[in-house]
């Protein structure tokens, strides 16, 4: 994907400079940026603590104070709760009034506990609709058809019986 973006940039020959990197190279980035575009932003949606990637992005944004565009085909792959760390680096994000994810979760997540061996752990996967409601003004959504995809996807669901032990872990 990087080489494709760079090839398009060369063809367009714009009067601005771009740097295209992957998330794994964030630590190498130097310079000042007016705009940062982050593709696959859902990859920063760790729970309940921010991922290393999200922390690096936050550091870059804090240093540069750029405009930020987050892109993702699947912004909430598991839960609306994942939105928090995707946007927490942006100073004007709709959740910036919360000190951290836990404060955010008290308002926007139905937190429940799950037994893990002899311990109970908090589970933050039941994000409320309020998260999407707060994010709506910042999001642009397209269907595959609106985005120009012509491929028809035919899905087939395969059901597989797991070992009883696996079901015990899940429950």
Locate predicted features:
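Conserved P-loop NTPase motor "coupling/switch" region that bridges the ATPase
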Residues: 35, 53-146
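Conserved Walker A/P-loop ATP-binding site and its immediately adjacent core
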Residues: 1-9, 77-82
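Catalytic P-loop NTPase motifs of RecA-like helicase/translocase cores
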Residues: 26, 43-48, 77-78
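Short beta-strand segments
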Residues: 1-3, 20-23, 105, 159-161
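Conserved two-lobed SF2 helicase motor
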Residues: 13-28
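Walker B catalytic acidic pair
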Residues: 39-40
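Conserved catalytic network of the ASCE P-loop NTPase/AAA+ motor domain
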Residues: 13, 29, 60-64
């Amino acid at each position: 994907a990087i080489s494709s973006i760079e090839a398009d940039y060369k063809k367009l020959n714009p009067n601005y400079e771009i740097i295209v990197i992957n998330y794994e190279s964030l630590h190498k980035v130097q310079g000042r940026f007016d705009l940062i575009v982050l593709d696959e932003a859902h990859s920063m949606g760790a729970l309940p603590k921010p991922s290393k990637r999200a922390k690096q992005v936050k550091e870059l944004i804090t240093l540069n104070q750029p405009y930020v565009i987050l892109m993702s085909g699947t912004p909430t792959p598991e839960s609306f709760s994942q939105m928090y760390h995707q946007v927490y680096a942006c100073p004007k994000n709709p959740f910036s009034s919360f000190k951290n994810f836990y404060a955010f979760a008290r308002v926007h997540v139905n937190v429940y506990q799950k037994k893990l061996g002899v311990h109970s752990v908090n589970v933050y996967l039941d994000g409320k609709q309020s998260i999407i409601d707060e994010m709506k003004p910042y999001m642009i959504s397209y269907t595959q058809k609106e985005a120009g995809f012509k491929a028809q996807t035919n899905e087939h669901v395969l059901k597989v019986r797991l070992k009883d032990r696996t079901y015990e872990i899940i429950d």
